[in-house]
Structure formats: structure tokens, C-alpha cells
Amino acid sequence: MKTSFLFFTVLILFFISASASEPAIWSVSSRSDILKGDARNVSIDSNGAVTLAPRLTEIYKTEQPYVWSSAVDAAGNVYLGTGGDGKVFKIPPGGSGSLFTDLAELNVSAVAVAANGDVFAATSPDGKVYRIDSAGKATVYFDAKEKYIWSLAVMADGSIAVGTGESGKIYRVRSANATPESSLLFDTSDSHIITLALDKAGNLYAGTDSNGLVLKF
């Protein structure tokens, strides 16, 4: 009797174990189906194809809610413009970052580095450009009298191109404390100059919102 009871107990446990180890099979037929899953270390393209993703490594946490902008100097130091406390952080090539300066503004929406190592940081919604020296001391370089400054670029002659909003104007600032009137490069009649970039020939390109234009100067 005990032998029979033991046999049936083992048999029941076997079937429970077998049932629990059965593989689950499902199929997906669209990108939206794939996106319902948790993508780990893979990329999903517009057609739903899954490929290995580049390895991502966290090197520094600013403890700020936003990182709005970044720039790299000749030595490989990375400067991060953040919000909403208006702080700029410096991360050397080794990755041990630290606070570079606190601008006492809301957002640092653009950062650029000049050839001499000076860092320029633009703020929003107060529309100012600060020059920051190697010690982290910041002074107002240009007051655009605009609500937003979205973009900066250092021109070949060292002047600073400044892209603004909400009036969509581009300024070229050649010296500290220059006025907006004397620095106006172009009024696009669009709302915002979201991005500025230079090519190897020194031509300036501007990308706008809300008409999505690309302008060359």
C-alpha cells in the first residue's frame, strides 16, 4: 500500500514538473508587437528588425532633471548644460565629472567652446550668453533681449553666432556687451533658430522652427 502511494505521488510530481517546464511559444508580426516587449541591448528599426545595439555605459550623473546641451573642447572635456537649475558640468576624458559653474538661471539651452578654451553657455528663458573661463567664473557676454537662445556656434574669426526664439533672429556677436542691434545677422521671420552649425569652409547653417527651414550664410 505504501509502495503504491509513493508511486502515485512520484507520478503526480512528474506531470506537474513536466507541465511547468513546457516552453511558451508566441509570434509577432509587426513593429508595434515587438515594441510591447522590453528591449535590452538591442535596436528595433522602423521595419521591426531587431539587431544588436551599441553598448551604452553611464559615466556620470548630473542629478539634474534635464541635460539640454553639450560641447567638447580640444582636450576632450565634455561640458553639459542642464536644467532646471542652470548648472554647467565638466566631464574630463576619465569620466569623473563635477560642477563647472552655476549660472543661477533656469536652463542652459546651448553650449559652445572657443579655440582659446573659453566656454560659452546660453540660457533660456532669460536669453543671455555667458562666457566661462577655465576656473568656472561666468560673466554675461551678450544679452539678446530675447526669451530663448536655442543654439550657439563659434565662427572662424572667434565671433559667436547666436540662434534665438521666439522671433527667429540670428546674431553674430564680435565682442563682449555688444548690443542686439549692432549684432543682428539675419531675421528669418520664423519662430525659433533651433540649431546652428559650421562647415569646413566656414559657412554657417541654421535650422528653424516652425517651418523647418535650413538656411546657409
Functional labels for PLM-detected ranges:
Residues 68-69, 109-110, 151, 195:
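Conserved beta-strand position repeated once per blade in WD40 beta-propeller domains
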Residues 77-80, 118-121, 159-162, 203-206:
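Conserved beta-propeller blade signature
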Residues 23-55, 130, 171:
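Blade/loop signatures of beta-propeller domains
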Residues 83, 124, 165-167, 209:
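Short loop/turn segments immediately following the C-termini of beta-strands
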Residues 72-75, 113-116, 154-157, 198-201:
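Residue-level detector of Asp-centered blade-edge/turn motifs that repeat once per structural unit
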Residues 91-96, 132-137, 173-179, 217:
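Short loop/turn segments that connect beta-strands within beta-propeller blades
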Residues 87-90, 127-131, 169-172, 213-216:
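A short loop-to-beta-strand structural motif that recurs across blades of beta-propeller domains
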Residues 59-63, 100-104, 141-145, 185-189:
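Surface loop/turn motifs at the tips and blade-to-blade linkers of beta-strand repeat domains
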